[in-house]
C-alpha cells in the first residue's frame, strides 16, 4: 500500500511543523523562511542567468526543507551564485544524513531526471562509497518492503525537491568531498559539490 499524495502532503506538513518547533520553539508554517517567495524583480534577474542545462539546481541542507512548488524561495535569490551548487554539512559517524536538491524549471519540462553520485573521499583517502547514497524520488523501499524505481519528470515552471539520503559509515571521520550529478536523460549533468564534516561518536 503506497501513500497517496494527500497522505504525503499531510506528513510533510507535520514534519515541517516539528522541524520549526525544534529550531525556533514555535510552529508558524506560513512564516517559515522557505515559505517566503522571492520577489518578481529578483526572479527576473535570476532568469537572465539561464544555465547551460536549461534548468536551475540549488543544493539545500535538511534544515531548510523545500516547500514551495511553483515559485522559488527568496533565500535562493539572496544566496551567492557560487553557493547554489555546493552542499556543506556536518554529521556524525553512523548517521543517515539527508539533504535536498531543488530543481527549478522555468524554461522547459524535464523528463527522466536522475541523480547519481561519486564516492566521497577524505584527506587520508578513506571513502564513503557512492553505493551508500540514494535519491528517494527515484528509488527506495515501499511500505510493503518492496524496492522500486521511478521516473522523475518535472513540469515547466515548477520546483521539485529531490531528497538525498547518505548512509555514513560508523568508522568515518574527517572532511569528505565528492559530487552529485543531476541530469535529464542523456544530457550533460549538473555537478553539485559535496563537503561533509564527519565528527563525533
Positions of predicted regions on the chain:
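Long, low-complexity or tandemly repetitive, helically biased scaffold regions used
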Residues: 1-5, 9
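Surface-exposed binding patches on compact interaction domains or structured appendages
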Residues: 20, 25-29, 33-35, 40-84, ...
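Short, solvent-exposed loop/linker segments at the N-terminal edge
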Residues: 89-95
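Conserved, mostly hydrophobic/aromatic
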Residues: 101, 180
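Beta-strand-rich extracellular modules
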Residues: 167, 181-185
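Short glycine/proline/serine/threonine-rich loop/turn segments at secondary-structure transition edges
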Residues: 170-178
